[in-house]
Amino acid sequence: MAAFLLVFGLLPLANWIPGGHSAPWFGVVAADLLTGLSVALGTGIVVGILAGKIRSGAVGARLDLSAAIERRWAVWVGGLALGAFGLYVLVSITAFSARPLLIDEIIQVVQARILAAGKLWVPAEPHQFFFSSMHLVEQEGRVYGQFPIGGPAMLALGSLVRGEWLVNPVFGALSVGLFGALVRRVEPRAGTALLATGLFALAPFAVFMSASHMNHVPTLLWLLIGMVGLVRSVSPSGRWLDGLVCGLGFGLAATIRPADAMAFAAPAGVWLLARAGSRTERRVGPLLGAGLGVALPLLALAWVNLETTGAPLRFGYTVLWGRAHDLGFHGTPWGPTHTPARGIELINVFFLRLQSYLFEAAGPSLLPATAALALARRLTPFDRYLLVGSVLLVGFYFAYWHDGFYLGPRFMYPLLPVLVLWTARLPAVLEARHTRTERGEPPTGESRPGSALWPTVRRAVLATIVIGAVLGLATSVPLRLSQYRGGLISLRWNADRAAAHSGITNALVLVRESWGAELVARMWALGVPRSDAETIYRAADPCRLDLSLGALEPAGIRGAAAAAALEPLLADSTRPAQPEAATGDPTLRLTPGVTYPPDCNAKIQANLTGFTLYPPLLLARQPDNIYARDLGARDSLLLRDYPGRAIYLLKPDSRAVGADPVFHRLDPDSLLREWRGASRK
């Protein structure tokens, strides 16, 4: 494992493999980390030497501190959990405006509110394409989110009190308590266990993720419950109930992120099965309890899938994107085919990012854990379990096609327990090189021959870690917080508050999106499969696509036939460029040297006057205002579906980054005249 972390965490393999994923930022980031490590290491060596000269009674003091921690373990962990909760809440408000910002978060909150209303899906609108969104499934008149039901079910607890944003801070704080309970059972040194718990609670990767709406946080909570149940199950006093807790934890994690749960449930099952079949132990009860615990959530998941997708083993993302979304080396929903080489690139990029995002320290974040794993002479059974589960997790994402970068390499979030545990163990592992503590005995100060240098090394390493953390807290963390606070500005706008301030009620609000978003929505309206729509949009000249859609729409050509009619546009992929300054949209690809017709130029000019995003408006709570995508003359369908309402156009008055959308009152008669004129062209 240490060798893997050294190779994948320090070498830019992705940059050495032609094509595919890469880490273009590696040189700059590596230079910064190397500089920070040099400063921390140099200072740490000086501190380690000086501390050795003034060291007095350190062994006894550590023994006293360890005993004090052990006596009041629950108080220490409880304090960390409460403090972490307050920190997560504060970061959620300051960094993310207590709102879901990524499309994954938005759609899971939409599904959570459907669940909170007592439904698994809602009926489609008469013209659903005005209300469509990426990751929102529209199947046979049913509308629901693409994600496994467990994540939205966790958020639904917050929906019941109009506070989805509080769910992850609560679950993150509970995870701190669970990790504290777990690590105290598997780590004999109280000080090391407390340090690991503190790192788990306060690692910036954990803080930012716990302040978000992402489903990785509740997944880790249930994984930890499964691990606590597992440790109790394999103890001499393990009972059927412990196995049930273990199974429920892994089973509920599977209802949120099935691959993450499988990675840690599979080795747990093997461990329990081995104990049940052992000639000396024959512990069958925990195995049966775990089997029942896993089965109950999975049966519930299968029933929900049956009621939504129509098949117990089919998920919403398979309905939306096809089998290309699944694990394996094959074609993907969009982009190149996923191959083992691309899998290696992704895993490498994940671990290179972890070097910064895990602790935001002055040096590489994975270095202490790597050193501890390399120097450790023996592993406990739980250590082996945790490492096997971690390897399986990495293996699953090696076979997955998507990068999924957000707030760090989020797919690696379940590695947090093993990484913080081995980071915290490094000082003890170094001490074990010259005392008997490697067997879990308390330090006695009795050194082995030839180990006089090890105490200084240990002090220098410990000082380096502390200095690196302090430097990171003073430099990297504020920069990361500023980065998150300044990102995704347009998704933070509160439609309900703005509408109430403007006195807008019982209105039909037409939301002006970019030309590119309109083109994608029009393909969805024609029934073009989502993966085909993404592929075509990423390749086609937007004007040619617009004209092609204009020919298909009145002809009533839909579904596979529409996708086939648009397929020749894929040949555009080698020609267009992305002149964002000329279009206002970085996703539009214009063909150089081509003179566009007036209608296409008008679309470009409309882009330049400002546009906004539709998906966040799916979360507007004011029920009497209807927010629908603006699709030009097709909006006349909305006027028939929702008669008697005041009509507004929602768009910013400027294309400046962060410009708030503005409600513009529209006259229905003028709109109808404009649409009739457009239809006669």
Identify what each model region corresponds to.
Residues 229-244, 262-303:
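Perimembrane helix-loop-helix junctions
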Residues 103, 167-177, 190, 194-230, ...:
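Multi-pass, polyprenyl lipid-linked donor-dependent membrane glycosyltransferases
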Residues 75-79, 248, 269, 291-295, ...:
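Signature aromatic-anchored transmembrane alpha helix within multi-pass, membrane-resident enzymes
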Residues 49, 174-180, 269-272, 278, ...:
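Hydrophobic, aromatic-rich transmembrane alpha-helices
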Residues 5-8, 76-88, 200, 267, ...:
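Transmembrane alpha-helix segments characteristic
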Residues 108-109, 209-210, 216, 256, ...:
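Hydrophobic/aromatic-rich transmembrane helices and adjacent perimembrane loops
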Residues 237-240, 275-290, 369-390, 403, ...:
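Membrane-interface helix-loop-helix junctions at transmembrane boundaries of multi-pass membrane enzymes
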Residues 20-36, 129-137, 283-287, 306, ...:
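Membrane-lumen/periplasm interface segments of multi-pass, membrane-embedded glycan/lipid transferases
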